[in-house]
Amino acid sequence: MKPLSIKAEEISALIKQQLEKYDDKLNVNEVGTVTYVGDGIARAHGLNNVLSSELLQFSNGSYGIAQNLEANDVGIIILGRFDDIREGDQVKRTGRIMEVPVGDQLIGRVVNPLGQPVDGLGEIKTDKTRPIESKAPGVMDRQSVNQPLQTGIKAIDALVPIGRGQRELIIGDRKTGKTALALDTIINQKGQDVICIYVAIGQKESTVKNSVETLKRFGAMDYTIVVEAGPSEPAPMLYIAPYAGTAMGEEFMYNGKDVLIVFDDLSKQAVAYREISLLLRRPPGREAYPGDVFYLHSRLLERSAKLNKKLGGGSMTALPFIQTQAGDISAYIPTNVISITDGQIFLEADLFFAGTRPAINAGESVSRVGGSAQIKAMKKVAGTLRVDLASYRELESFAQFGSDLDQATQAKLNRGRRTVEVLKQPLHKPLPVEDEVLILYALTHGFLDAIPVPDIQRYELELYDYFASNYNDLLDVIRTTGDLPEEAKLNEALKNFNEGFSISKK
């Protein structure tokens, strides 16, 4: 047997090679220990350098967000299920804040607040993410709202117009048509180059399913993302859902696109935040909400804006919902959100049950953007509509006490009844803006004064068909220029239609 020959040169070459490859960087993680877990909340000891809102990872792979930074421990809200997290488990810092996937790949999908698909259509392949919390655009980054966002709902586009980049609160009791209003607005964005995001917070799974089916039926899911945090989810998921939806919208807004985001509804988010705060032992304030509940909504809604040309001119229009109790809009959360937004649409239960749908109370509803968010034609026909409606409501209450009314008062009452009837609209039938202008022009110029109230809805439908067949050029003028066609031609066309319209026999 030959003796083993060891060559010193080979050994030194191998050692040199290993030394060159040697990585002396240590992977250091700051790790803490879970001391309490329950109700979507955990407390951990040992994370001395953790940052507020930092994303933390538990030993089982779950994530949480550092919410309370206290002297001896950290209060953490757990994202998702917490059944398999135990006292004594390790939790480590990640050094980043929570992010969600963003981009075109999310369009047409239903996702949870973490951006994970829940529609069974497979994974979402996107490598782009955005933090759920980000700074709102500053004053110099914005421009004033000057472009309308057509909802297709006559009462809104005429009385409380919404502009691209505006925040318009929709407020009312449960079952007064808030969700229907938002779905109709989303459906009306077809072909308008607007990306829509519908954030369902604490809505029943069956309700969300119906909403998604409605959007699919009208082809609206082609430009819509649905973010769903159901009532069976832990409170932290309901709390982060609106921020996740806004982050998805910001990706489009900062790329020069127009976005419409609907929060259905922020009352449930406030309740979830109250639950989290009480579990974290934060001092309760009015109605047991924590002291920073105003900031909860203001930092969310301020991220919706119309950006200036330098930043691409994109916009995000927010429609936050708030549910009231017995029509009380002076409660804590409603008054908070009213003061943050650029106006509110108040849906009244009494009007809804009396058959006025959408049940918009014109007196309580306001848009602080106003005429800037209307085309010229709409401004001309809807200018006096709000005042006329308010004076009709006033006269109507007085008219109940006596029948001896002068002719002018009687004429106002007649016009008011027809105005209320014209502003009614069936579910999921938003109108193009030229049709809205047409019927409101006919109303304000007296063409409906001789038409009995029960015939108004039939008159309206026949009017649209008549103009589409015989006077499409007049509708084209409104559609393309945004202004009224020659009034003489329009009056002539309406006069011709009225002559051929058959009034129902009593």
UniProtKB/Swiss-Prot annotation:
Where does the UniProt annotation locate this protein? Cell membrane
Q: Which residues form the signal peptide?
A: none
Q: Does the record carry Transport as a key word?
A: yes
Q: Where are the residues marked Required for activity as a site?
A: S365
The answer to whether keyword Chaperone applies is no
Name the source's superkingdom: Bacteria
Keyword vocabulary terms for this entry? ATP synthesis, ATP-binding, Cell membrane, CF(1), Hydrogen ion transport, Ion transport, Membrane, Nucleotide-binding, Translocase, Transport
Q: Which InterPro entries match?
A: ATP_synth_asu-like_sf, ATP_synth_asu_C, ATP_synth_asu_C_sf, ATP_synth_F1_a_nt-bd_dom, ATP_synth_F1_asu, ATPase_a/bsu_AS, ATPase_F1/V1/A1_a/bsu_N, ATPase_F1/V1/A1_a/bsu_N_sf
Known EC number: 7.1.2.2
Assembly and partners are described as:
F-type ATPases have 2 components, CF(1) - the catalytic core - and CF(0) - the membrane proton channel. CF(1) has five subunits: alpha(3), beta(3), gamma(1), delta(1), epsilon(1). CF(0) has three main subunits: a(1), b(2) and c(9-12). The alpha and beta chains form an alternating ring which encloses part of the gamma chain. CF(1) is attached to CF(0) by a central stalk formed by the gamma and epsilon chains, while a peripheral stalk is formed by the delta and b chains.
> What's its job?
Produces ATP from ADP in the presence of a proton gradient across the membrane. The alpha chain is a regulatory subunit.
Protein name stated in the entry: ATP synthase subunit alpha
List the lineage, top down.
Bacteria, Bacillati, Bacillota, Bacilli, Lactobacillales
